[in-house]
């Protein structure tokens, strides 16, 4: 196959092989998501307190391949000299090692089952609930199967650093076959840059690379401060192992499940990056013989990459990267075929061992999200308040200017095959994306770390770029919007070579040996990705009337407040509540990741009903007080290791390992309903005006990340166009309305 790198083309025209038929919708599709969970963008927060039980609930008794390339077991902590938390803004230097935080507890069985029923009640019919309650009671009865499994879980807790980590990782990520873009990998959009030329863009890219390697070195030598809790149980240390994995992990497709690889045992090979431009791939050295290249030397290599591609007159490279966006088991099969060629094995190893991927993209056309832009304009003309669904109204009036929704599509999936989706390698943890018009960001593979860890690293990287530490003479392009102080990275520890770049390193073009079978698979992957991209309904809502400062003055947890607003918006859209996911960080425990904060409770349902029928003010306020107090209690339970979902997952998997028949609690329809998250949410706070978004986790659901700033809130809303029941436009309107009404409800207490 021959491709012209200087023009865009329809990939399908170049293939005459077998075409895969479009998959037909199937009711069974929903079942794929019942245990998939969420993309777990972790909210850091900590509280103290005793186990909280639902109001009015009866008491229940309960017993107290390293790069050959094989997956590496997680380690609870590693020797460090220091460690930080910009999340908590509280730090303590630890001269010897990270503190050994406690193990994640196994919650009491009765506690978990009681809360499970509390969350089931508002999402089941009364007859279904009674049936589910009987099944739960049977499972939890004294000397019953639940207690037997619980006893084995406690033994597992005593034997392992984290009793649920491997089960959770498999269930939420590695066993899920869905494509990574939209379904798993979040996209992060940075503050908009002003590039006067390609050289400006390249300088910014070099700074991203240099600052990332600075951060990687700090992680390796233990030069981070220990993340610590900032609320109740203040200063309690948090587990730091997620930082270790950000620049040294790779998600390899495999059968029957993916593998999360570590390259820490191959440190000498983990000193380069891979650069994509117009689907061409290059290896670019950053450390040579133990010495870091200078800013000018890295810049020269990146300039050479762009020059070589723009002047290239040979056959176009096969767009192998598009296959990383396909179904994971399909990509695993394709990878096996690729690896059958020795040259391809070398290229795969280069990609798998790189520190990060750098993608120079073509900007998506403004028409890409024209339907969203048009509906935004229509929405804005109907409103006279200062709330809007975009950064600036003028963006919508200027059809030649890309908006941030367009940029969000660019970071999440690349826009499809004929745009940039093949200019990616979605398996790699960190992919920086840059475009000539100044929209830059990140697409990151989620299995190795939570969003807050990645965001903290990225914000320190962006702040270091804005500082004098990394400014080179004659370079004026600095990030906008970084107004809050973040620790500036220290000077790099590697010695810098000053030798001419030609004598140190030049970019190496990565060549693939592609068979007709792989050509057909690339075509099929392009078809699949394009359908996925076309199906995504994505929208940014900037709510400008107030932010977290108002919520705090109203003596409310901002997170609980926003969760109630999301519930009210969903209730207005659909006339009911739904199983809701919000990630809750469990990093105060060893190898902690996240549990699920659920907002679907009878108390929230009662408040939503009162709001919709415009009940008397006193009634609405009283029910709000009850609902938000309970929501805060649920948050407390989760971050203290008393969540429901992780424990149920452990009970289910432990039963399998014991060889027991599947308990009815896990086969009953109520369990499927409980895990069908039509509302998948997460708080992703940033200091700069950056934001992170993702797709829904079920076909008839919404994705809703939120970033509460002091005086405004940024929501990233997503749904699927193929679902007639969902609409981000309508959901966004009802979310604005909910926030307006909640302000009216609480204004009297705010001084």
Spans of features found by a protein language model:
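Long, Pro/Ser/Thr-rich low-complexity/intrinsically disordered regulatory tracts in eukaryotic proteins
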Residues: 2-5, 10-428, 437-438, 445, ...
């Amino acid at each position: 196959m021959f491709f012209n790198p200087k023009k865009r083309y329809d990939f399908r025209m170049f293939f005459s092989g077998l075409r895969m038929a479009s998959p037909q919708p199937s009711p069974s599709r929903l079942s794929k998501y019942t245990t998939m969970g969420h993309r777990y963008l972790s909210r850091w927060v900590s509280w103290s307190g005793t186990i909280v039980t639902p109001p009015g609930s009866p008491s229940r008794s309960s017993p107290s391949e390293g790069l050959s390339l094989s997956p590496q077991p997680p380690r609870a902590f590693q020797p460090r000299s220091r460690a930080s938390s910009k999340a908590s803004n509280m730090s303590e230097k630890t001269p010897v090692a990270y503190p050994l935080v406690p193990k994640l507890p196994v919650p009491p069985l009765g506690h978990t089952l009681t809360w499970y029923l509390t969350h089931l009640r508002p999402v089941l019919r009364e007859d279904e609930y009674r049936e589910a309650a009987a099944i739960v009671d049977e499972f939890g009865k004294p000397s019953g199967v639940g207690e037997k499994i619980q006893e084995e879980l406690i033994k597992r807790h005593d034997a392992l650093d984290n009793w649920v980590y491997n089960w959770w990782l498999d269930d939420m990520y590695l066993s899920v076959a869905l494509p990574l873009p939209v379904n798993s990998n979040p996209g992060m959009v940075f503050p908009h840059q002003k590039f006067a030329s390609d050289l400006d863009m390249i300088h910014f890219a070099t700074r991203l690379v240099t600052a990332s390697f600075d951060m990687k070195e700090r992680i390796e030598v233990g030069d981070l401060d220990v993340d610590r809790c900032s609320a109740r149980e203040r200063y309690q240390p948090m587990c730091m192992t997620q930082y270790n994995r950000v620049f040294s992990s790779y998600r390899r497709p495999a059968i029957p499940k993916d593998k999360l690889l570590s390259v820490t045992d191959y440190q000498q090979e983990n000193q380069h990056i891979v650069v994509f431009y117009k689907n061409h791939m290059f290896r670019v050295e950053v450390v040579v013989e133990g010495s870091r290249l200078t800013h000018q030397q890295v810049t020269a290599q990146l300039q050479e990459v762009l020059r070589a591609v723009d002047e290239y007159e040979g056959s176009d490279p096969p767009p192998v990267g598009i296959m990383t966006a396909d179904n994971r088991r399909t990509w695993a099969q394709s990878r096996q075929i690729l690896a059958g060629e020795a040259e391809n094995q070398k290229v795969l190893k280069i990609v798998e061992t790189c520190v990060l991927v750098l993608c120079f993209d073509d900007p998506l056309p403004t028409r890409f999200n024209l339907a969203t832009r048009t509906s935004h304009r229509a929405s804005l003309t109907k409103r006279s308040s200062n709330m809007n669904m975009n950064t600036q109204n003028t963006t919508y009036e200027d059809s030649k200017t890309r908006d941030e929704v367009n940029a969000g599509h660019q970071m999440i999936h690349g826009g499809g095959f004929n745009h940039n989706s093949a200019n990616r390698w979605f398996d790699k943890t960190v992919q920086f994306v840059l475009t000539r018009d100044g929209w830059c960001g990140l697409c990151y593979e989620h299995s190795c770390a939570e969003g807050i860890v990645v965001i903290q690293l990225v914000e320190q990287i962006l702040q270091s770029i804005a500082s004098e530490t990394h400014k080179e003479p004659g370079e004026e392009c600095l990030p906008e919007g970084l107004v809050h102080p973040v620790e500036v990275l220290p000077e790099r520890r590697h010695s810098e070579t000053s030798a001419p770049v030609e004598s140190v390193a030049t970019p190496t073009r990565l060549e693939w040996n592609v068979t007709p079978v792989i050509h057909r698979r690339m075509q099929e992957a392009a078809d699949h990705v394009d359908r996925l991209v076309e199906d995504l309904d994505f929208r940014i809502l900037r709510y400008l009337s107030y932010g977290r400062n108002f919520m705090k003055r109203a003596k409310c947890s901002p997170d609980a407040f926003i969760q109630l607003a999301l519930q009210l918006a969903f209730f207005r859209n659909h006339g009911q509540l739904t199983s809701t996911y919000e990630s809750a960080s469990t990093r105060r425990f060893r190898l902690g990741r996240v549990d699920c904060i659920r907002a679907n409770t009878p108390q929230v349902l009662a408040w939503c009903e009162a709001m919709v029928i415009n009940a008397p003010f006193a009634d609405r306020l009283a029910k709000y007080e009850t609902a938000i107090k309970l929501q805060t209690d649920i948050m407390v339970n989760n971050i203290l290791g008393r969540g429901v979902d992780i424990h149920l997952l452990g009970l289910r998997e432990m039963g399998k390992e014991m060889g027991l028949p599947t308990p009815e609690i896990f086969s009953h329809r109520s369990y499927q309903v409980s895990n069908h998250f039509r509302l998948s949410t997460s708080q992703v706070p940033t200091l700069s005006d950056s934001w992170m978004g993702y797709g829904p986790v079920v076909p008839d659901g919404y994705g809703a990340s939120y970033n509460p700033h002091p005086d405004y809130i940024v929501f990233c809303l997503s749904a699927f166009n193929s679902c007639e029941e969902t609409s981000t436009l309508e959901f966004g309107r009802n979310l604005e309305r909910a926030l307006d009404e909640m302000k009216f409800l609480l204004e009297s207490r705010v001084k």
